Amino acid sequence: FYDTVKGGDYRAREANVYRLAEVSNAIIDQCVAQGVPFAREYGGTLDNRSFGGAQVSRTFYAKGQTGQQLLLGAYSALSRQVNVGTVKLFTRYEMQDVVLVEGRARGIIAKNLVTGKLERFAAHAVVIATGGYGNAYFLSTNAMTCNCTAAISCYRKGAWMANPAYVQIHPTCIPVHGDKQSKLTLMSESLRNDGRIWVPKKLEDAKALQAGTKKGKDIPEADRDYYLERRYPAFGNLVPRDVASRAAKERCDAGFGVNSTGLAVFLDFSDAINRLGKEVVKQKYGNLFDMYEEITNDDPYETPMMIYPALHYSMGGLWVDYELMTSIPGLFAIGEANFSDHGANRLGASALMQGLADGYFVLPYTIQNYLSDQIQVPRFSTDLPEFVEAEKAINARIAKLMNVKGKETVDSIHRKLGHIMCCLLYTSPSPRD
């Protein structure tokens, strides 16, 4: 609880954070029951490790792919419910708008991405679980399908937004390596457990690295500046993400960047390999090392990784109350789509924890408070005027966009606006820079 509140610069809603801490143990039990293969000690007990911003090892993990394994566990449980008929799944649909009837959320309009047709869905309540708005920036680590259209539709209908300026810059991303990229690749936070972050002490060494006449392994140990360990001895390389990102940018702005663009620092595992052995490091991070080598063609066992901060997560989102309902009655927002749990900065692994807590242990109970006085309300017809008007407005907007005779693509406009957003975010003197 304290680490989360402090790591978020005391800007999180403490009641929600306290509840998150209370249900955290139950989250692990739930995931184990779903078959998530968490790492275990030799005796069979669950293993854990430190993540950024916490000085206690309390993060349970599944090698370097915890998020993926949690998704597989959740999808397996969902598929079981689909199979027995308790859940109907609509794949390849995109929400276009939320429908309000007498001021309450009563359904949505969605587009079938296979046929292109709009379809109406009525409900007694609507839950938004569509992630954040990181792709407003260019580049980010978010998948391109995470476009925030659902949350923005709710905002346009009157739902409040909270803390939209709070976005997280993740310190361990693979640097930009071309002008054709649509997104950046995130390297797991777990790498900072054993990897040491450094830049050269001498500016001439940094210039040589940028020119390609030297490699990281050619820099003597005495000439390496482990700047996080130097500045923050209590945390070392496991400082909160915002601190690590600002420190990396400061070193690169000072001219100590280590790649051709000058926008990278080293994440070095040579000390861990010497201390633990290559096989132990491979067992812990092998899949991440393989991914890094496939993207960069550099072997991280032999030469230090290059990393640089990149836009990763949005702490802001739709405003919700303690029961996760937005300012629109009947409209709920969970996970990264809401603002409640992280304040100005999210700790490592807390996004997974919040998503699981909201979905498994909070919303199933709080939504019942809202639905309890709706039990007498009959099922809504999608022929109501509100549904007809919402669909008509969407068709009009689509027709307007399709009839624009411009010469720029949507993607090019997104890139331009995203670059402006990143310029503002990285605190350049002006967007022109």
Identify the role of each PLM range.
Residues F1-V5:
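N-terminal glycine-rich dinucleotide-binding loop that anchors FAD/FMN and/or NAD(P) in oxidoreductases
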Residues F90-T91, Q96-R104, A110-K111, K284-N338:
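A glycine-rich dinucleotide-binding beta-alpha-beta segment and adjacent secondary-structure elements
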Residues A125-Q181, H342-Y365:
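Glycine-rich loop(s) and the adjacent beta-strand/alpha-helix scaffold that form part
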Residues A15, Y61-Q65, V114, L118, ...:
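Alpha-helix capping and helix-loop boundary segments enriched in small/acidic/polar residues
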Residues K6, R13-N16, Q30-S57, V101-E102, ...:
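Glycine- and aromatic-enriched mobile tails/lids
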Residues Y10-E14, T45-L71, G134-F138, L267-E279:
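Helix-loop-beta segment of a Rossmann-like dinucleotide-binding subdomain
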Residues S153, W160-E294, Y365-Q368, C423:
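An anion/pyrophosphate-binding glycine-rich loop and adjacent beta-alpha core
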Residues I27-K117, A129, C173-M187, R192:
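Conserved redox-cofactor binding core of oxidoreductases
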